[in-house]
Amino acid sequence: MSLADSVLAINNDLPIRTDSPVHSGKVRSVYWLTDADSRRLITTKGYNVPEDTPLAIMVISDRISAFDCIFHGEGGLKGIPGKGAALNAISNHWFKLFAENGLADSHILDIPHPFVWIVQKARPIKVEAICRQYITGSMWRAYSKGERVFCGITLPEGLEKAQKLPELLITPSTKGILTGIPGVPAQDDVNISRSDIEANYQAFGFEKLSDIDLYEKLLKDGFKVISKALADIDQVFVDTKFEFGYVTDKDGNSKLIYMDEVGTPDSSRIWDGAAYRDGKILENSKEGFRQFLLNHFPDPDVLLNKDRMPEREALARDNDLPLEAMMQVSRTYTGVAEKVTGAPIPLPANPKADIIKILKDEYDLIV
């Protein structure tokens, strides 16, 4: 079987029983189960949620997105070998560590396969919860242009690129396009301040004003747990994005939980510790792939300028990236996952067939 066959690039065509359209994101696809199947699994599998909780099968792919586009490689390679399994393995590890440290639950109820989560439906907070320990990326770009207020936070003078910040900073942005919020443009990923959230907390999906404090605590506490664990394997946790939502527990109480993935090379910047001490930046995250793209194409402005999206989409669609570049990303992702979890990352030869078999034999969800 070829390398291309081992990559799960299309994940929205599985014959999973559902009565709703499949939701396809950049990397994951979500299959909402029927009410009958949700109730059956909650009962037979003993999931600790109310019997009427809607459940979904969330299937990760090996696709790689950057600058809001999906890229592909030579030889029909439509994704990164091992990427999906690596991302799930890392998130699974951190969620387990969060539970051990008494933090909030996640939306995951079951892990039938390295590419698959069974999740409970949550009511999402419409905030990209971003936490930064070092100044880089968009914060550095703004700072280097003379801006000293970022997401409502005043930054001190004299900071240098990649320097550790005086304290852990929360710099949220909008999740999706939100309309009708004073002072917040109706665009995706717009930087916002805590005061923006406080003044419009219900529009951002918070049920109580005090839950803003809770989300910030869960974000910082989760960041610190991951940062300490990464430091133990000489990796630097630079910055990350978390997502949060509400679920209803068995007693009918609403509670805030972690959603999506946490602490992965897709959602975070991770630097090699030894290289950083030598004054160098060695990326162990998707940031390395972004830098490759900026150097690979002759006009990097296409990738950075939001006004040139049609050109960017054509660039991603019409160019096969070098195989070695794709495999370097594979080595980065699987390498980080193996360091974090202490176990090899399984690379099934035919992941789609494996997923269908497990969901049929063990969950009776295949039509």
Curated annotation (Swiss-Prot):
Pathway: Purine metabolism; IMP biosynthesis via de novo pathway; 5-amino-1-(5-phospho-D-ribosyl)imidazole-4-carboxamide from 5-amino-1-(5-phospho-D-ribosyl)imidazole-4-carboxylate: step 1/2. CDD domains: SAICAR_synt_Sc. InterPro entries: SAICAR_synt/ADE2_N (IPR028923), SAICAR_synthase_Vibrio-typ (IPR014106), SAICAR_synthetase_CS (IPR018236). The keyword Cytoplasm does not apply. Keywords: ATP-binding, Ligase, Nucleotide-binding, Purine biosynthesis. GO terms for cellular component: cytoplasm. It holds the Pfam family SAICAR_synt. Coiled coil: none annotated. One of its GO terms (molecular function) is ATP binding. NCBIfam families: PRK13960.1, purC_vibrio. Belongs to the SAICAR synthetase family. This is Phosphoribosylaminoimidazole-succinocarboxamide synthase. It comes from Shewanella baltica (strain OS155 / ATCC BAA-1091).
